[in-house]
Amino acid sequence: MSPDNKLKCVFSTLTDPRSHINQLHLLNDILLIGVVSVICGAETWKQMVQFAKSKESFFRKFLVLPNGIPSEDTINRVFSSIDNLDFERCFTEWITSISTLSKGQVISIDGKTIRGAKSHGKKSAIHMVSAWACQDNLVLGQIKVDEKSNEITAIPNLLEILDIEDAIITIDAMGCQKEIAKTIIDNDANYILAVKENQASLLEDIHDEFRFSKDITKHTSVDGDHGRIETRVCSVITDFQHVKKNGAWEKLRTVIKIESKREFKNSDKPTENAIRYYISSCTLEASEFQKSIRSHWGIENKLHWVLDVGFNEDASRKRNQNAAQNYSILLKIALNLLKNEKTEKQGIKGKRLKAGWNEGYLLKVLGLKV
């Protein structure tokens, strides 16, 4: 079954928020118009309608459209009122149905603020936490951070709806919490958690481990790219004493230090030095820890950056009810479909343009044969 057909099946389980009296348009049709128009460059409800009207004959090949193309008000109202948790569940089920994650896959968890989606009278913009499969380049799921809370409470909820068995979960220092580590282990996965000043006692104990330990495994890598040379040294300790006194971190087996030095070849910029620390339930070689930790930044470069540059997410002004969260899911469905299409060797922006121009290529992105 194609990704698009599986998407239709999953969408059929979504609760329709509308009254069943005098419905003119099918929920499935509205949702698929949203997905396809976003793939092809639409950024507003009005643009979705304009695109769908210009491609009505194309849409009729796989949609019912009993009363033609829905209006802008209808599309706005539907995406604003769909329960965002229900939509997030559908999204996660769809990803699970079209992908098989390899054992030991690194899944990065990180948050992003949708800066344009700030409602009048609200203190802050909407903040989403997403899960990114680093090797497969797929968004696995997302969850909204409650306005009166933070990522610490949202991350366990996201982990519970994902299938993370045998995966390695990487999270920045915000997620370095004992309950989060326990949730990961309870779901048969492993963790690599960044440690900073928010866990001051733990950080001090890790400093002591590297100060006094005589059994440290190291791996050094050197990369030259974009006019700079970066040297990284990954140091690993598995036989530690000081950290054990810090409390019960579930299945904690390894402490890690990454020292990086960045030198600029043709610039007056000074050399940049940084040291970062991590705890992990994994028992890997130093080289594998270095690789896993580096891959975490794929969620910044391949997801957050692409959503901003390729989809212009930060400029979105969708504020009504659940519109911002649900539109964010649309973007991630579109991103996954575009990344899943491997024949076109260009960036997301270029793929979106081609999908809008070329119906044959759009069918390829959707995995449809009509």
Predicted ranges, named:
Residues 196-295:
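An anionic, glycine-rich sequence signature occurring as long contiguous blocks
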Residues 258-339:
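A C-terminal functional module that forms or caps the active site or interfaces directly
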